């Protein structure tokens, strides 16, 4: 019987693949970073995915988001990317949630047990609460710290928040997390200085500007995050088997 994950199993082994099939990963935010993270997860054989975003596919998403096609314009991002996942792996268990993660309604998003969380949310207040909630509940979490206005994907790094530098969002997150008593959490960040940009659209409520974004930087960041989750889950299974 053919196995679509055979090439992955050659690296991660049968035990690693079994661990992935039994794993439940939640991805919060399905934009340029989150959509590529989902792609890495589903193509690697993760068995259960919760996909969370409150937005719909818009024309300006076509330059960087995997669920964004002319045929999906106006559809919910969560449902659109879930359809893509089903086509990649019909056996995957999917929970698309159309909604925005906020502290006031967090329990809606935690009615299932997650083995890993990928935080690809834009809003700082929501990121802070999600990180605190995950750490309090003992759920591994990896957070994206912004890929907008960046040109060079080779500068992307996954490290502890305490080791970040040169990133304005990382600076804000370090300060706000410290105020909550959190000094350590895993993040994806880039020290690259933001590129000069020209504003072409009005910012949504609560934001001062719309960040420019390219295909390859958020895409590479999302693949890195998805890959990190896959390797962590497979590695943990090997350690538990010893």
Language-model regions: role of each:
Residues 1-26:
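N-terminal charged helix/coil linker that caps or initiates catalytic domains
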Residues 2, 110-113, 121, 125-126, ...:
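Glycine-rich phosphate/adenylate-binding loop
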Residues 27-29, 52:
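Conserved N-terminal Rossmann-fold NAD(P)-binding element of oxidoreductases
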Residues 33-34:
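Hydrophobic/small residue at the entry helix of a nucleotide-binding pocket
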Residues 46, 51-89:
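Glycine-rich phosphate-binding loop and adjoining beta1-alpha1-beta2 segment
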Residues 97-106:
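Conserved SAM/SAH-binding loop
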């Amino acid at each position: 019987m053919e196995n679509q994950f055979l090439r992955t199993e050659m690296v991660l082994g049968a035990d690693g693949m079994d661990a992935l099939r039994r794993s439940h990963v939640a991805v919060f935010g399905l934009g340029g970073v989150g959509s590529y993270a989902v792609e890495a997860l589903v193509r690697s054989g993760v068995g259960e995915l919760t996909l969370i975003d409150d937005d719909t596919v818009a024309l300006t998403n076509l330059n960087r988001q995997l669920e964004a096609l002319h045929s999906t314009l106006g559809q919910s991002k969560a449902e659109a990317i879930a359809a893509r996942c089903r086509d990649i792996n019909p056996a995957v268990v999917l929970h698309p949630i159309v909604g925005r993660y906020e502290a006031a309604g967090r329990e809606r998003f935690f009615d299932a047990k997650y083995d890993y969380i990928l935080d690809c949310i834009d809003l700082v207040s929501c990121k802070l609460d999600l990180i605190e909630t995950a750490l309090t509940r003992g759920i591994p979490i990896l957070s994206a710290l912004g890929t907008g206005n960046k040109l060079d994907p080779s500068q992307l790094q996954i490290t502890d928040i305490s080791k970040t530098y040169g990133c304005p969002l990382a600076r804000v997150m370090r300060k706000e997390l410290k105020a909550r008593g959190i000094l350590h959490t895993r993040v994806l960040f880039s020290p690259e200085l933001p590129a000069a940009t020209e504003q072409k659209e009005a910012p949504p409520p609560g934001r001062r500007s719309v960040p420019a974004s390219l295909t390859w930087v958020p895409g590479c960041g999302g693949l890195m995050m998805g890959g990190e989750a896959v390797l962590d889950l497979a590695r943990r299974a090997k350690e538990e088997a010893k």
